[in-house]
Curated annotation (Swiss-Prot):
Name of the protein this chain belongs to: Uncharacterized protein in nifH2 5'region
Organism name: Methanosarcina barkeri
Lineage of producing organism: Archaea, Methanobacteriati, Methanobacteriota, Stenosarchaea group, Methanomicrobia
InterPro entries: FAD-bd (IPR002938), FAD/NAD-bd_sf (IPR036188), Geranylgeranyl_reductase (IPR050407)
Superkingdom per UniProt: Archaea
Family, per entry: Belongs to the geranylgeranyl reductase family. ChlP subfamily.
């Protein structure tokens, strides 16, 4: 028999979006389970790790409430601070523009965020793959065994090939720009 558990919120994917969502849910009193299939949070690295300065983001999205995770992170996560970006296009054009930000060590940053979620009260299970989602039940398999987990809310932060999105009819399709934008937010 597969053991059962119950949480207010199950977050699938412990990248920046998933760990931040788990942290805020836990801070607001929810029982939270944060799941990630990887052996080590942040590895393998999923992207280059550029993070614009919070003031740059706030200037673009004036009414947005930015999470603390975009504003406050340890210097140990910063590989380099920058104030200028240069982009080389495929046809060898160069675009340069001023933008303040930091290049982060994504492995350290992702681990920092997962630690913040755990400190806020979220439970973290790594090496755990989501095998099925049916309604509000998440089935997992991993080093902790197989579980059936009931959740009041399921947050899919599991990337562009999201099992959560597929289970909710939001799978990535080539014809839908809205779905593509939604699915690529991490």
């Amino acid at each position: 028999m597969i053991p059962e558990a119950s949480y207010d919120v199950v977050v699938v994917g412990a990248g920046p979006a998933g760990s931040t969502a788990a942290m805020y849910a836990a801070k607001n009193g929810a029982s939270v389970l944060l799941l990630d299939k990887k052996r080590e949070i942040g590895s393998p690295i999923q992207c280059a790790g550029f993070l614009p300065d919070a003031s740059e983001v706030q200037a673009l999205l004036r009414e947005a409430m930015l999470p603390d995770t975009l504003k406050n992170y340890p210097d140990s996560c910063v590989l380099q601070r920058i104030d200028n970006q240069r982009i080389f296009t495929p046809n060898c054009n160069i675009k340069e523009f001023a933008v303040r930000g930091a290049v982060l060590d994504r492995c350290r940053y992702d681990q920092f965020l997962a630690e913040q979620a755990a400190r806020a009260g979220a439970e973290l299970m790594i090496k755990t793959r989501v095998t099925k989602i049916e309604g509000t039940t998440v089935e997992t398999s991993g080093v902790f065994g197989k579980y059936r987990i009931k959740a009041k809310a399921i947050i899919g932060a599991d990337g562009p090939n999201s099992l959560v999105a597929k289970s909710k009819g939001l799978a990535l399709t080539s014809g839908s720009r809205e779905t593509r934008l939604l699915s690529n937010t991490r």
